[in-house]
Amino acid sequence: MNLQAQPKAQNKRKRCLFGGQEPAPKEQPPPLQPPQQSIRVKEEQYLGHEGPGGAVSTSQPVELPPPSSLALLNSVVYGPERTSAAMLSQQVASVKWPNSVMAPGRGPERGGGGGVSDSSWQQQPGQPPPHSTWNCHSLSLYSATKGSPHPGVGVPTYYNHPEALKREKAGGPQLDRYVRPMMPQKVQLEVGRPQAPLNSFHAAKKPPNQSLPLQPFQLAFGHQVNRQVFRQGPPPPNPVAAFPPQKQQQQQQPQQQQQQQQAALPQMPLFENFYSMPQQPSQQPQDFGLQPAGPLGQSHLAHHSMAPYPFPPNPDMNPELRKALLQDSAPQPALPQVQIPFPRRSRRLSKEGILPPSALDGAGTQPGQEATGNLFLHHWPLQQPPPGSLGQPHPEALGFPLELRESQLLPDGERLAPNGREREAPAMGSEEGMRAVSTGDCGQVLRGGVIQSTRRRRRASQEANLLTLAQKAVELASLQNAKDGSGSEEKRKSVLASTTKCGVEFSEPSLATKRAREDSGMVPLIIPVSVPVRTVDPTEAAQAGGLDEDGKGPEQNPAEHKPSVIVTRRRSTRIPGTDAQAQAEDMNVKLEGEPSVRKPKQRPRPEPLIIPTKAGTFIAPPVYSNITPYQSHLRSPVRLADHPSERSFELPPYTPPPILSPVREGSGLYFNAIISTSTIPAPPPITPKSAHRTLLRTNSAEVTPPVLSVMGEATPVSIEPRINVGSRFQAEIPLMRDRALAAADPHKADLVWQPWEDLESSREKQRQVEDLLTAACSSIFPGAGTNQELALHCLHESRGDILETLNKLLLKKPLRPHNHPLATYHYTGSDQWKMAERKLFNKGIAIYKKDFFLVQKLIQTKTVAQCVEFYYTYKKQVKIGRNGTLTFGDVDTSDEKSAQEEVEVDIKTSQKFPRVPLPRRESPSEERLEPKREVKEPRKEGEEEVPEIQEKEEQEEGRERSRRAAAVKATQTLQANESASDILILRSHESNAPGSAGGQASEKPREGTGKSRRALPFSEKKKKTETFSKTQNQENTFPCKKCGR
């Protein structure tokens, strides 16, 4: 059949149609003639089984099988390249669709792309019987031996004959021009009816009460003449290739002649039948034996000697299949069947390439049905012909040498596969494209490999890539196998099988998948979108060939069927033949090289919750059969049977089951209960880390779930859900009382601050408070000099008494008892930092920036929180050296030069009070040290700290006196004192800044001191004025970090 592609002038992509759409006539290319011939070829093969009896007149109407076999028809659309001759040859009979599902839109969209407008379709008189097209789907698919359909059956070789090919090429375009103008839309729609006879054949063949499934693969994928899909073996590219040479040649001589004659005959009477013939509603039982040919030139069938071939018993054959085969030989009336709507095709199903469930249900699920209607669903064991008839497949049977047939797969991109129709590959962008190449005999490799019923158009480039891969794979396969195919018969068979490189996984699914489908009762969907295709190695093919002659097919080793690439394209448009080869090549490159199968993503699902309903009645699901019944420890452990007559007995409170699974990983809710109630000496094991995986996903008896139940035999058990009713479960409601009594209740909160009445109105009191806060920021207080917050708290506790507040602040013992709510309260900035700690802090900040964890590791004597607090306390008073170094807090100022180089940066809220200019200016370091020391005292509140604080205070007092005595020499004195002192205490000079403002104020005096140090050598007065003016100016502005202005 290796026909060269007919180049078409118009490269317009064909629109795929669904439903009742009727395409414009110009978009309905006439189909090629090869499919019809292939149909007849297979028909003859099948008729060989039946015998010549009971020929049916061409005018007898035939009713199609139910929609179950129709689902595959709706995707069949001829590519634009198909010639009118093929379309004409397939105008077998006009038949009425019995079901609305098979009506116009769903009808075979083959030739015209549209459906048949009639609600039912019947064969028209004068037209060839529809069974001729159906036979291509029948037993030639399954029952033939590995290499041969049946020894006694001759197969017409019209499509393989060179002259016929030439005539086809010459006549195609002319017929196209001749036919198109006179074809109305309805006729063009009915051009697709050649597949209706296919359905009608099975409908007539099947016994009553059988629902025949669609011929799943070939119908939707189109007719491929020379391909055979053998369930039991790799299909040879030419059906006659495996025939015994003598009989093949003898029977094929008249076939070739008649087919050549028919090719030359004009095909136009078919359309006259469409126009004039009334449709006959009557339906008659038909025997699909040999019959005289109709106007389409099926007369060549009559010349074939079609001896009935008995089916030898095969142990591997399903009894239903054997019975079906026996029944096929007897004529049976075709009965209309209940319409079974087909489920919508899904992409996943299409990847798996399984039959539509309804199609399989037609044969498998209905009681009266047998395997005849279900041919595609069963793996047919090979029917062994008489041993004498078996011979090597004759390569020259069709007049083509084996090498020539193989070479026809390869040349100039016009042949996609031995079937010679590269157009099919464009039609099937997915694996069906490959399958169409490789599916073998039943000529119709489900023509619409990709769902052709979509209206959306895909880019030509996408299809070009896919189909190029497909053709490439076929060519590579044939080339590789041609080298091995010159030897023995097995090698030759392997060549024939591997030329279909993609294999016929659809025809030969693994045993596991077949059993799963049959057992589940769910009929697999066959979706001509993307079918997994397996690659066939020549060695496997040879082995399979050897097995097939013994009646054992490759099903014996299903594990070797490795699926190849699955192309999940759902939509495809026909592409001119020029692009087809490149696309097929690219696609087959994938198929050859990488058998990667795209796996759908599996979404993680939560572990199943397994909680028993009742003790003893819990039956673990079979999937989790190794999980033992579990009694929740939180549910009521009561056995009602133990207390049958006790009316006073009360059930314990019912605790609902846990939300989480008892076998989840971790200790869970039951660990404590197990430990507490366990009478076993050793505590039961906790649920292992991966318990939920091992327990819930394995069925091995080795995995033992943790023993969570520790209740003995005598433990009463009651886990019946119930509502806890009774006085035990009621809340105690106090008696109603007068609301006025609430005022007398002591408040449970601690009163921290409450301003007295005349504070806002009395200016004198406000001035006193301000003075107190100013003093709190000075070094006169041994403790708490760093923060105004402490002063305010003391003032509150003293009920506004300023003198009492000063006394509290001057005390060297803890301000509050240990049980006071503020006893452990930390006042910001009250930490005491030694000079060494400050140096380390500045060093750490310079190295690690604000990574206080590393800074704390460097200091080691302060916590991370204290480091953070120190940083933000002095952040706004950082001293920036001329080299850009930042200095936080007071460091060793013994180096006069470094002190002069520092520039003070004052915080905007800090204030220096003119009332106490000298202390602030002359002894800033002491003031800083003092506040910190004082703050540390209240925070620690320890008596042991008092001596240390006292020493510090004495030292600082001495320093202050000396500095005040000689103001001009204060800088030197300060430096000496600072170097001598180990502890520096932060001091805040801010009077109005609450909270951390005190700490910031303490920084300010420090900075003021630095300035004074720098300015004192010149004049004390100059430094005072500079400091005050700078402080007042910067009070409400952000200072410049470089110049301090």
Swiss-Prot record:
There is a cross-link at K166, K590 (Glycyl lysine isopeptide (Lys-Gly) (interchain with G-Cter in SUMO2)). Residues 828-879 form the SANT domain. The modification Asymmetric dimethylarginine is found at R193. The modification Phosphoserine is found at S461, S661, S709, S923. SMART domains: ELM2 (SM01189), SANT (SM00717). Residues 240-264 have a biased composition (Low complexity). The keyword Cell cycle does not apply. InterPro entries: ELM2_dom, Homeodomain-like_sf, SANT/Myb, SANT_dom, Trans_reg/Corepressor. It is found in: Nucleus. The modification Phosphothreonine is found at T655, T704, T715. Residues 132-146, 970-980 have a biased composition (Polar residues). Residues 721-813 form the ELM2 domain. GO terms for molecular function: DNA binding; transcription corepressor activity. Residues 943-957 have a biased composition (Acidic residues). This is Mitotic deacetylase-associated SANT domain protein. It comes from Homo sapiens.
